[in-house]
Amino acid sequence: KNVDKKDYDSRFNNTCNQRVNIDLISEDIKSSYEKLYNNLNTFEGKMSLDKIKDTDYYKEFVTKMLYRYRASVYDKNAEDPYCWMSYLLKNYKSEEVYDFCKKAFAKMKKEKIRVEEFLSPDIKSKAGRVSIKYFVGIRVLDEMVDLYRSFGENGIDCYIVSASFIDIVRAFATDKDNNYRMDKKKVLGLRLMKDDAGRILPKFDRNFPITIREGKVQTINEFIKNDRNYGPIMVGGDSDGDFEMLTFFDETEIALIINSENTGSIESLRKKAIEGYSRFYLQERNVNEGRFVSLEKS
């Protein structure tokens, strides 16, 4: 839902150099998932997860889900164009999202940081064989933890305003094992509707702004600012989705750009930071070690 139907960029051609699109890849994902569902012992089958992992349909499902996430772009003409990734969580409850996210975070923190290539098996499929490279590993940034704590100790409230689905961000930011230990109420993000049973629906909750670009400014103005406080004295971000938040508020003394080398409008702010503008600062990082560094290039 809400994914552009046109062929993917040629960078994502299959191994036979043929174009692929969301309809083709979705058929393969559906087919492999049905096999997983019918064979995995936690669903309708008798096979353990360890044995399932050796099957072609497991490898097909994992590779093409990762490929779908990386290759797909949102449909700019859709009603809620940005939300398509979160729609994958349809029918989950918040507690279930929290649970599997925390398990995933715990596992990824133990993984060696690396770039891994996934290749789908040589089986009959609609999209053909595809490969995709993925960054594996997640780390708690000690420098960021120290910053949050220092602010808190000096009476400065810290908030997270993320473009990601709110339940996923809260699962990470509030987890005691991740050291951030944020107050759940101070972690804001994309919100979806839920049914009467609390299950997530693939529909944006219009009681809240979409937390990207201008929507992040709206979120701060509507849900953080009040008669007893004012705009943020410091804002951090790394992409175009943060541009308005980094530039909008007159009260902001420090706009910290985390250098992830994303392209777009954020490049102009990186340039200002390098040129020495008093408001903008560039923070480099060592992605291989999961930490911030005092260098001119990440």
Listing of model-derived features with the role each one plays in the protein:
Residues 2-134:
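A metal-dependent, Asp-based hydrolase signature
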Residues 75-76, 92-298:
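C-terminal cap/substrate-recognition subdomain and adjoining C-terminal extension
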